[in-house]
Structure formats: C-alpha cells, structure tokens
Amino acid sequence: MTTPNPNKQSVELNRTSLFWGLLLIFVLAVLFSNYFFN
C-alpha cells in the first residue's frame, strides 16, 4: 500500500464525521418522536 494522501485522508475523516453526525441526529429524532408521541 502506498502512503495515503493527507488531503484524501482529511476528506475521508470529514465524510466519517458527517456520517456519524447524521446518525446521531437520526437517533435523537427517533428518541424525541417516541418521547413526544407517548
């Protein structure tokens, strides 16, 4: 394997953090909807 490009690495990191952020928002939305509709 060649050494990873730092730019590529930062883009990958941003994509991963964006994915986790969206996942966290989705989970919070589900929890809040369950809380409000009960």
Curated annotation (Swiss-Prot):
Top-rank lineage group of the source organism: Eukaryota
SUPFAM superfamilies, per the entry: Photosystem II reaction center protein L, PsbL
Transmembrane segments: 17-37
Coarse class of the protein's main subcellular location: plastid
Membrane topology: Single-pass membrane protein
Disulphide bridges: none
Gene Ontology process terms (BP): photosynthesis
Assigned keywords, A-Z: Chloroplast, Membrane, Photosynthesis, Photosystem II, Plastid, Reaction center, Thylakoid, Transmembrane, Transmembrane helix
GO cellular component, one term: chloroplast thylakoid membrane
Compartment annotation: Plastid, Chloroplast thylakoid membrane
Keyword check for Chloroplast: yes
Function recorded in the entry: One of the components of the core complex of photosystem II (PSII). PSII is a light-driven water:plastoquinone oxidoreductase that uses light energy to abstract electrons from H(2)O, generating O(2) and a proton gradient subsequently used for ATP formation. It consists of a core antenna complex that captures photons, and an electron transfer chain that converts photonic excitation into a charge separation. This subunit is found at the monomer-monomer interface and is required for correct PSII assembly and/or dimerization.
Family stated for the protein in its record: Belongs to the PsbL family.
Quaternary structure note: PSII is composed of 1 copy each of membrane proteins PsbA, PsbB, PsbC, PsbD, PsbE, PsbF, PsbH, PsbI, PsbJ, PsbK, PsbL, PsbM, PsbT, PsbX, PsbY, PsbZ, Psb30/Ycf12, at least 3 peripheral proteins of the oxygen-evolving complex and a large number of cofactors. It forms dimeric complexes.
Name of the protein this chain belongs to: Photosystem II reaction center protein L
Organism name: Chaetosphaeridium globosum
